[in-house]
Curated annotation (Swiss-Prot):
It comes from the Bacteria. The keyword rRNA-binding applies. This protein binds specifically to 23S rRNA; its binding is stimulated by other ribosomal proteins, e.g. L4, L17, and L20. It is important during the early stages of 50S assembly. It makes multiple contacts with different domains of the 23S rRNA in the assembled 50S subunit and ribosome. InterPro entries: Ribosomal_uL22 (IPR001063), Ribosomal_uL22_bac/chlpt-type (IPR005727), Ribosomal_uL22_bac/org-type (IPR047867), Ribosomal_uL22_CS (IPR018260), Ribosomal_uL22_sf (IPR036394). Coiled coil: none annotated. PROSITE patterns: RIBOSOMAL_L22. It comes from Rhizobium meliloti (strain 1021) (Ensifer meliloti). The gene is rplV. This is Large ribosomal subunit protein uL22. GO terms for biological process: translation. Belongs to the universal ribosomal protein uL22 family.
Length: 129
């Protein structure tokens, strides 16, 4: 139950994409999200392409989805997009048991995370008026 979740309102020059229940810890996902925050989308895609982190492929796919949403749903110019926000949230934690010595067992927690990427269209600086 509880109260209804307040949706974040996007501005007219923004678009977003969300990846839910990604099988990685939020801390590890946040390391990759920090790589692309505030960068132009083409630069961010290049960084994700050559990143050695396992989860970089999922982040790249989510960023490409945000770019496609900006182009197709919001009619924004792809060449002037930046990654305005890339934030990570906790999701479920799967609990599993790991057999130990002497007939004992210990709990292993397998965390999941949510990723939200917001891209924003910025005006080119130095345009002649």
């Amino acid at each position: 139950m509880g109260k209804a979740k307040a949706e974040r309102r996007l501005k007219d020059n923004e678009a977003q994409a969300v990846a839910r229940t990604i099988r990685v810890s939020p801390q590890k996902l946040n390391l990759v999200a920090a790589l692309i925050r505030g960068k132009k989308v083409d630069r961010a895609l290049a960084e994700l392409e050559f990143s050695r982190k396992r989860i970089a492929g999922t982040v790249k796919k989510t960023l490409e989805s945000a770019i496609a949403n900006a182009e197709n749903n919001h009619d924004l110019d792809v060449d002037s997009l930046i990654v305005a926000e890339a934030f990570v949230g906790k999701s479920i934690v799967m609990k599993r048991f790991h057999a130990r010595g002497r007939g004992r067992a210990s709990r292993v927690e397998k965390p999941f995370a949510h990723l939200t990427i917001v891209v924003r269209e910025v005006e080119a600086k130095g345009e002649a008026a």
